[in-house]
Amino acid sequence: MNYIIKQKPEDFIVKEVPNKIFNKINGKYLIYSLKKINRNTEDCIQHLSRTLKVPRKFLGFAGTKDHNAITEQYISVFNVQNLKSKIENIKGLENFSLEFIGYLDNPLSLGDLATNKFEITIRALDKKVDIENPHSIINYFDEQRFSKNNHIIGKAIIKKDFKNAVEELKKQNQTNNELIKTYKQDYIRILRLVPKKTLKFYVHAYQSYLFNELCKKIIIDDKINHFKINYVLGELFFATKEPKNYSLPIIGFGSEIQEKNSLVFNLLKKEDIDQRDFIIKQIPELSSFGTQRDFIAKVINFSCTEFEEDELNKNKYKVKISFELSKGSYATIVVKKIFAQH
């Protein structure tokens, strides 16, 4: 069934549910609620760093949030002298605002949240349908992670095929052609012209691709009833009933392959890679140890409104769904699962 999400920012609302209790009296770090609209989290953090004239490392957050959305999350700011009053007197913040919440003795860092709460308006629906609680999803990474060739660049870096990585980067206009001419075949130097964070994102995109492929192999191997939907890198398989959960590797040089060993090793063989390929001596900061991720993500506190006429799309319907997901899981996968069955 066709649909539209994020037709306007109010259609996609995300709020963090923290896993910490904030002190109301004092602490080494100030905690603020950051509310933003159509802004990247890191853009807001960099803006605050410049405005307050403090190092970027003084500011922390628990997770990045969607750009094309209204989001609410928590940030920490190192509590140096008079900084709280400086923040209170900031003027002219564009598309984001701050509200003081309390204190912590440690900074917020990636992963310091319990869940994310979503309110999503689904638009341009041809008809009213019965929407059932999905209860769980296969914990795929969704299309936002990949674009057209992010994972291809990532694999080229992992394989030390730096020439191909540069060629693929040129397709994304991530490199300066004049500098490429200057450095000619010094591909490692050319790659270092790209921000480190961006290069890491490409490596993570390839790791995410491997994870998705592993999930699909498990569905086939466990003979799980499923249906398929298309996405930017092929197909995703969705289980019709909740299957057994597994702790799966986000493959890196230090990943512990605890379950489904043969499927993991067959996938690595098919991709012609080895775990030690994730050690990148030429650009050490891109090396990736790896981590674990659940095969299944629970959909918590799911609810759905009645269908209404869609004021933005003539002769169409809209509906709002609300739910929570654990950190790192994709709300758009929940939407895919619900509407692919109609």
Model-derived segments and spans:
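Ser/Thr-Pro-rich, acidic low-complexity intrinsically disordered regions of eukaryotic RNA-binding
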Residues: 41-47, 331, 335
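Extended, charged/glycine-rich binding lobes that contact polyanionic ligands
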Residues: 1-24, 29, 37-40, 51-314, ...
